[in-house]
UniProtKB/Swiss-Prot annotation, chain A:
GTP binds at residues 13-21, 61-65, 119-122, 149-151. It is found in: Cell membrane. This is Ras-related protein RABB1c. GO terms for biological process: endoplasmic reticulum to Golgi vesicle-mediated transport; protein transport. It comes from Arabidopsis thaliana (Mouse-ear cress). The lineage of its organism: Eukaryota, Viridiplantae, Streptophyta, Embryophyta, Tracheophyta. GO terms for molecular function: GTP binding; GTPase activity. It is a lipid-anchor.
Length: 211, 674
């Protein structure tokens, strides 16, 4: 399928916060509580529409365990957006946000759009991090913030799309040189013609994952 | 001392632990480090610093060190680091010239250095670890006469050094911008590295270059240029040996053996293998050892073993306008050597025939060979895996094994009791335990739950898995628990069907593969480095491609190596592959040859589609479930034979899954390092 733009996303955060479930909810619209833990990285993709333009999101779902950080860091390269996820029922996953953010700031493009997601908001009775704390952290660090639930799908669609909309706006505002793929954006057919406007290698090799 | 750092998740966070691991596994080198033109050998390079008696420990024994001279030189305002081993002063006969040249660091520019980690313990030798932008690192450089501080001070005079905020012993190189805008070059993103275009590059072992090699390279260089000028892709048409190589069909059956006997020798005789391409990165062309061409010609008429079962690995989609460099081990699309056809799995009768009357394995090699070529019938795995994993000794009798099992059962119960006896009150004050238990609880319910044996709520096998992993994290508290371990344990428990037996088999496996789970990922980096060396040896054009496309860190093979292809094959196939690898029949590092085999199968697609790192990673990920096991194992066997001694020499000593040389302790004592 052709797209105007392709955005590379990366999903980061502690192990078990629901990164893979968020991805699956977004790409397949289903919640699968039983799935294998992520080793290395997994990929997902979906087409969305912003401003009447088809945009393909290529999403990298990373392993969360501390030991794999040195590998995970190599995945940040060329990401246009990041979903930084914590689990509202586990305080420590919130406490580790600063270190994830530090990684992202160090290894990703400075213009990368970061969405902070407090996941598992369906488990409000076990809440260990208040919404205000999430908001406050996001504000302090210039992130977009949402609480979401991969289980009920609440705000999942919104989180991915709002991130894309922010990136799209940055393109409109000329923040990115879209011909430079290190920003995590590829211009496809129908996108703003740039020096490399014809470059659309991913449509043919994307495999079956963009359904 | 680390216990007070409550933020840290695991005891293996300890820098000391990491360091001790790093020492033990002989660590890494940058594969292309030796191939740059060496400014230190030029007249105009300015010598900045020279330090004698700086050594590398290829094994965990300091007595087996390789001593050499560390130098900093400067040319065109770029600082270079080199370390050259002394000639003929190896302290141990086990270490050959080859080892020494393997470790040589030839003029690495600091633009490619990401960080320097220093270790200046009060006891023992000081050392530094130089980490490159690619994420790879050189093995620790031990300063036998001290002077790490002085070394760093001098480096600091010439490049920008900034102390890492995370670790005061780590100095980030070229970290000259604000934290938000650090240059790619100072981090792990090699994309911004300067490319030494137009420079001649030399083979890694150029440090020990001899006249013969120089001549060979020159000859080949001439031939290459003429081929390139004529625009021919299949340079083999120029190979005069081609016309001589019509051979009789009856020789076909000898090809494999012939190749086995000759390739190693050929490869070492003809150093031109691989060295040619490095001069012509965009148009790699190869010189073929004469006899190999003959083999290829013979095979031309042979029925090719069919492995192109799935489309993912087929080459046909490659557009014609991209000139994919030919595979040096192929001739007219027919691989030069190939492995034996797979045999049916070994059954009970056959196994029993390999035992003496009291149950000893008469000849372990015969058993390992049999398993290597055919695997094991499932019902028999429970009896054979403990041998392969090293839990049972091959020369043990039935009675001895029975006794071992009962002793180990009690020992397991004792170990398990250690965490089972932790009261809720005690757990409150035991963060490390709670964290580990929490992680394990979360992960066992995310391991192979689609597989019948582990599916459903309150599955007893899942509980066993949790108990084994938690017990292991007490048995080996330093290593603890890391994701990926449950992937190894799952088939073991499924095969052994007994908690204690599974635990001890897992323990035996972790003796070899524990370094995969080191917090600093050193065991992984060592293997990825060895893989890069093997690809360089067995498919230089592909190696060059990875080099040009910033893929030399081989992170795209991370999952393959971390859990030995567990996620790439279906359950039964994974068990087949594991038992083949665990025989260590042709090589302890057979899994790396499996990696090469798969990569070579995809080489045309990778290069033809000009995959960058991201695309390649995604592509490799999506191979999962699409790799044919039997043909891959055959390819890997052929590659392993083909690489011969040169292959073995490409893999640094101590690379997992090699057992630690010191049988006494699983992990080197801290005192060795501190």
């Amino acid at each position: 399928m052709s797209y105007a733009y392709l955005f590379k996303y990366i999903i980061i955060g502690d192990t078990g916060v629901g990164k893979s479930c968020l991805l699956l909810q977004f790409t397949d619209k289903r919640f699968q509580p039983v799935h294998d833990l992520t080793i290395g990285v997994e990929f997902g993709a979906r087409m969305i529409t912003i401003d009447n333009k088809p945009i393909k999101l290529q999403i990298w779902d990373t392993a969360g365990q501390e030991s794999f950080r040195s590998i995970t860091r190599s995945y940040y390269r060329g990401a246009a957006g990041a979903l930084l996820v914590y689990d509202i029922t586990r305080r420590e996953t919130f406490n580790h946000l600063a270190s994830w953010l530090e990684d992202a700031r160090q290894h990703a493009n400075a213009n990368m759009t970061i969405m902070l997601i407090g996941n598992k908001c369906d488990l409000a009775h076990r809440r260990a991090v208040s919404t205000e704390e999430g908001e406050q952290f996001a504000k302090e660090h210039g992130l977009i913030f949402m609480e979401a639930s991969a289980k009920t799908a609440q705000n999942v669609e919104e989180a991915f799309i709002k991130t894309a909309a922010t990136i799209y706006k940055k393109i409109q505002d000329g923040v990115f040189d879209v011909s430079n793929e290190s920003y995590g954006i590829k211009v496809g057919y129908g996108g703003i013609p740039g020096p490399s406007g014809g470059r659309d290698g991913s449509t043919s090799q994307g495999g079956g994952c963009c359904g | 001392m680390s216990m007070e750092a409550s933020e840290l998740q695991d005891l293996s966070d300890d820098a000391d632990y990491a360091a001790s691991q790093q020492q033990g596994s002989a660590s890494m080198m940058r594969s292309d480090s030796g191939k740059r033109s060496s400014p230190s050998e030029h007249e105009d390079a300015e010598l900045i610093y020279l330090k004698d008696n700086v050594a590398i420990h290829p094994t965990q024994f300091a007595s087996e060190r390789i001593s050499g001279r560390l130098k900093l030189t400067k040319q065109d305002s770029v600082l270079f680091l080199s370390w050259i081993p002394y000639k003929g002063q190896t302290s141990n006969a086990k270490l050959s010239e080859k080892d020494r040249s393997l470790y040589t660091i030839t003029a690495v520019p600091f633009t490619e250095v990401r960080s320097i980690r220093r270790h200046t313990p009060t006891l023992g030798w000081q050392y530094v670890i130089v980490v490159l932008s690619s994420g790879l690192a050189f093995p620790p450089l031990y300063f036998y006469n001290g002077g790490v501080r002085e070394f760093l001070a001098i480096v600091k005079q010439h490049v920008f050094l900034a102390r890492s905020s995370e670790d005061p012993n780590v100095f980030i190189v070229n970290d000259f911008q604000s934290p938000l805008q650090r240059t790619l070059s100072s981090l792990e993103l090699p994309s911004s590295l300067p490319v030494a275009s137009g420079q001649s590059v030399y083979p890694l072992d150029g440090g020990s270059s001899n006249e013969n090699q120089g001549r060979t390279s020159a000859d080949i260089g001439n031939r290459v240029s003429s081929v390139i000028q004529s625009g021919l892709r299949k340079h083999k048409n120029h190979d005069p040996t081609r016309d001589l190589s019509i051979h009789l069909l009856e020789k076909f059956s000898l090809v494999t053996k012939f190749a086995r006997d000759t390739t190693t020798q050929l490869f070492s005789e003809n150093n031109g293998f691989g060295s040619v391409d490095k001069r012509w990165n965009n148009q790699p062309v190869h010189s073929y050892p004469e006899k190999l061409s003959n083999i290829a010609e013979e095979k031309h008429n042979e029925i090719r073993h069919s492995y192109s079962e799935n489309d993912l690995l087929k080459d046909e989609e490659i557009s014609n306008d991209i000139d994919v460099p030919a595979d040096p081990l192929e001739f007219n699309n027919i691989s030069l050597v190939w492995g034996k056809p797979r045999q049916p799995p070994m059954g009970h009768k056959e196994f029993t025939a390999l035992l003496d009357s009291e149950g000893r394995v008469v000849e372990s090699k015969a058993l390992r060979e049999r398993v290597f070529y055919g695997g094991i019938e499932h019902q028999l795995r429970r009896e054979v895996w403990p041998f392969l994993l090293g839990y049972y000794a091959y020369d043990s009798t039935y009675a001895e094994r029975e006794y071992l099992r009962s002793v180990k059962r009690m020992e397991y119960a004792t170990l398990k009791q250690q965490w089972q006896s932790i009261s809720p009150e005690q757990a409150k004050r035991f963060t490390k335990y709670r964290e580990r238990k929490g992680l394990i609880d979360k992960d066992v319910v995310r391991t192979d739950r689609a597989f019948e044996y582990y599916e459903g709520d309150d599955n007893l096998h899942v509980n066993s898995m949790r108990d084994i992993l938690l017990t292991y994290s007490f048995y080996n508290f330093d290593l603890g628990y890391c994701q990926g371990m449950s992937d190894y344990l799952s088939p073991i428990l499924f095969v052994m069907e007994d908690e204690s037996e599974s635990f001890w088999c897992f323990v035996a496996l972790m003796e070899r593969l524990g370094p995969n789970f080191n917090r600093d990922q050193n065991g992984m980096h060592t293997q990825l480095f060895a893989l890069s060396k093997l690809v360089e040896l067995l498919d230089t054009p592909l190696h060059n491609y990875f080099k040009q496309n910033d893929c030399l860190n081989y992170f795209f093979c991370f999952r393959w190596i971390l859990i030995q292809f567990k996620r790439e094959f279906e359950y039964e196939k994974t068990m087949q592959l594991w038992e083949v690898m665990w025989t260590h029949y042709l090589s302890e590092h057979f899994h790396l040859y499996v990696c090469v085999a798969v990569l070579k199968r995809c080489r045309s697609k990778i290069m033809g589609e000009q995959m960058d790192f991201d695309t390649l990673l995604k592509f490799i990920n999506e191979l999962s479930g699409h790799i044919d096991l039997d043909s891959t194992v055959r390819d890997a066997e052929a590659l392993c034979i083909c690489a011969g001694e040169n292959g073995a020499a490409s893999i640094p000593p101590g690379t997992p899954p090699s057992l630690p040389l010191d049988d006494g302790t699983l992990y080197p004592q801290e005192d060795d390092v501190l």
